[in-house]
Amino acid sequence: LHKAIRRQRQMCIRDRICTYIDSHFREEIHRDELAELVYLNTDYMSRMFKKEKGVSISNYILQKRVDEAKKLLCGSSIPINTVSLHIGYSNFSYFTKMFKENTGLTPLEYRRKFGEETHV
């Protein structure tokens, strides 16, 4: 019974963190503010999140940003530097590096390969 209660609590905490990140991923998010949100020690919260989601908090945020960038790159003609700013990266070079590490393509290459104009 105790394991079931603990598991339910961990799932609830994970869901609260994910909901917060999903709503605020365009902003700078710090682990300590997430820990305050769920009333946990920062390190414990990070370990628990990774155990529950299979990915670290920073990688979860990165994936949310990359997914949003993909949508914007494919579904609009918004300049790539504006896409970078929209998803929370003020440093365009860093955005390009993170995007390429995650997708294997630069944002421009991704747009050329998967953008709307290539499917017309």
Predicted segments, located by residue:
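Ca2+-coordinating acidic residues in Ca2+-binding motifs
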Residues: Q8, E33, R65
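Residues within the alpha-helical elements of helix-turn-helix
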Residues: L37, H86-I87, N102
